[in-house]
């Protein structure tokens, strides 16, 4: 059985010189969590399997991803590094990979131009391309008969709508259908973030995580809502995810990566120690 991956996420803004890791609730009310390079070093030493580095304001502001911060981060870590935020061209991907990233995450640009996934996958390989999908629950079933309807924890039927620009713009696109299309176009992984759960510490959005894990053949990275090790366990055991991404519980030293992995190992979830 393949080991499950634990992936700290560094959400970075350019609000101060050199970049700053931030965390908020549903991508708003952001508070500083530290220097991205120092946090990356700590996670590398603590046993993280990979790192995800997201310039969360790049797409919204049309700004190029922070190449200098990527270079400094890549110099300090020796585990796979995925970089996302404002990536909308082949040249940008090339720059980021040259700066030291192992994979790139595409989100808004892929929704706007799905062929960008195929083009980038053809050039750099599917293993290099992660499609990030931000989604929100939508309980308007009556007016959306073509959507994939799932049953929420309380029995309410809902479909999941893709949102872009850091959650600021709804698209009307069904998240399950979009994930399948991204796989067909050549994406090597899906990074799934529930905007309803992001930063809430209420646990992963299990219905959509489980649905994508069951429907797709490529790995699903669960994201949004981790507040304790039990939530990560549920992401694997109930959500069937291949990897668990978390931010708050690691950034603010509530739990170490080693503690989380020990918790999972004791519950027979295969992890790399």
Swiss-Prot record:
Cellular compartment(s): Cytoplasm
Subunit annotation: Heterodimer of HisH and HisF.
Main location: cytoplasm
SUPFAM superfamilies: Ribulose-phoshate binding barrel
GO molecular function: imidazoleglycerol-phosphate synthase activity; lyase activity
GO biological process: L-histidine biosynthetic process
Residue numbers annotated as active site: 11, 134
CDD domains: HisF
Function: IGPS catalyzes the conversion of PRFAR and glutamine to IGP, AICAR and glutamate. The HisF subunit catalyzes the cyclization activity that produces IGP and AICAR from PRFAR using the ammonia provided by the HisH subunit.
Organism, as annotated: Methanosarcina acetivorans (strain ATCC 35395 / DSM 2834 / JCM 12185 / C2A)
Gene Ontology cellular component terms for the protein in this record: cytoplasm
InterPro entries cross-referenced by the UniProt entry: Aldolase_TIM, His_biosynth, HisF, IGPS_HisA/HisF, RibuloseP-bd_barrel
Annotated protein name in UniProt: Imidazole glycerol phosphate synthase subunit HisF
Swiss-Prot/TrEMBL keywords: Amino-acid biosynthesis, Cytoplasm, Histidine biosynthesis, Lyase
Family: Belongs to the HisA/HisF family.
EC number: 4.3.2.10
Domain of life: Archaea
Catalytic activity: 5-[(5-phospho-1-deoxy-D-ribulos-1-ylimino)methylamino]-1-(5-phospho-beta-D-ribosyl)imidazole-4-carboxamide + L-glutamine = D-erythro-1-(imidazol-4-yl)glycerol 3-phosphate + 5-amino-1-(5-phospho-beta-D-ribosyl)imidazole-4-carboxamide + L-glutamate + H(+)
Pathway stated in the Swiss-Prot or TrEMBL entry: Amino-acid biosynthesis; L-histidine biosynthesis; L-histidine from 5-phospho-alpha-D-ribose 1-diphosphate: step 5/9
HAMAP family xrefs: HisF
């Amino acid at each position: 059985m393949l080991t499950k991956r634990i992936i700290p996420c560094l959400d970075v803004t350019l609000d101060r010189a050199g970049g700053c890791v931030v965390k908020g609730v549903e991508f708003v009310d952001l508070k500083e969590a530290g220097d991205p390079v120092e946090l990356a070093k700590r996670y590398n030493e603590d046993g993280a399997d990979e790192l995800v580095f997201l310039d969360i304001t790049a797409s919204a502001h049309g700004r190029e991803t922070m190449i200098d911060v990527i270079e400094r981060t890549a110099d300090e870590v020796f585990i796979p590094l995925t970089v996302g935020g404002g990536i909308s061209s082949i040249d940008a991907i090339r720059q980021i990979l040259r700066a030291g990233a192992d994979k790139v995450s595409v989100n808004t640009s892929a929704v706007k131009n799905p062929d960008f996934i195929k083009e980038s996958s053809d050039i750099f390989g599917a293993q290099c391309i992660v499609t990030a999908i931000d989604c929100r629950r939508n309980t308007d079933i009556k007016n959306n008969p073509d959507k994939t309807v799932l049953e929420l924890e309380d029995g309410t039927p809902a479909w999941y709508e893709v949102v872009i620009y850091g959650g600021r713009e709804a698209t009307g696109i069904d998240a399950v259908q979009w994930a399948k299309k991204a796989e067909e176009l050549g994406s090597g992984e899906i990074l799934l973030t529930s905007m309803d759960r992001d930063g809430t510490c209420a646990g992963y959005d299990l219905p959509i995580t489980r649905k994508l894990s069951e429907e797709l053949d490529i790995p699903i990275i669960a994201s949004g809502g981790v507040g304790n090790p039990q939530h990560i366990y549920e992401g694997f055991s109930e959500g069937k995810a291949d990897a668990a991404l978390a931010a708050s519980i690691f950034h603010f030293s509530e739990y170490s990566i080693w503690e989380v992995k020990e918790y999972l190992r004791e519950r027979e979830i295969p992890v790399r120690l």
